[in-house]
Curated annotation (Swiss-Prot):
Protein name in the entry: RNA-binding protein Hfq
Keyword Transmembrane helix set for record: no
Family in the record: Belongs to the Hfq family.
Gene of this entry: hfq
Function field: RNA chaperone that binds small regulatory RNA (sRNAs) and mRNAs to facilitate mRNA translational regulation in response to envelope stress, environmental stress and changes in metabolite concentrations. Also binds with high specificity to tRNAs.
Keyword RNA-binding attached: yes
Highest taxon, organism lineage: Bacteria
The organism of origin for this protein: Legionella pneumophila subsp. pneumophila (strain Philadelphia 1 / ATCC 33152 / DSM 7513)
PANTHER family: RNA-BINDING PROTEIN HFQ
GO annotation (BP), single: regulation of DNA-templated transcription
InterPro entries registered for this protein in UniProt: Hfq, LSM_dom_sf, Sm
GO molecular function, one term: RNA binding
Stored HAMAP family: Hfq (MF_00436)
Description of how the protein assembles with itself and partners: Homohexamer.
Paired cysteines (S-S): none
Length: 85
């Protein structure tokens, strides 16, 4: 697993599991709202009144509507982190 996935995947997965509403800012400035339904290496499925497939390379920022705990990876020896809005 690449280094950036050590934060990205647990963060997105926690948002998905807890159904936290998010604002997703794209690199062109467009702001999307919704709940992360699923994601993979290349895309995030963002659900609102419809489900949108958003390519990760087009995403600038993901802002959760509330604080989210990111579970620490057991093998990394790092502390559990939090991300605040």
């Amino acid at each position: 697993m690449s280094k950036n996935h050590l934060l990205q995947d647990p963060f997105l997965n926690e948002l998905r599991k807890e159904k936290v509403p998010v604002s997703v800012f794209l690199v062109n400035g467009i702001k999307l709202h919704g709940i992360i339904d699923s994601f993979d290496q290349y895309v995030v499925m963002l659900k609102n009144s419809i489900t949108q497939m958003v390519y990760k390379h087009a995403i600038s920022t993901v802002v959760p509507s509330r604080m989210v705990k990111i579970p620490a990876e057991e093998s990394s020896g790092e502390e559990e982190g939090t991300v605040a809005d």
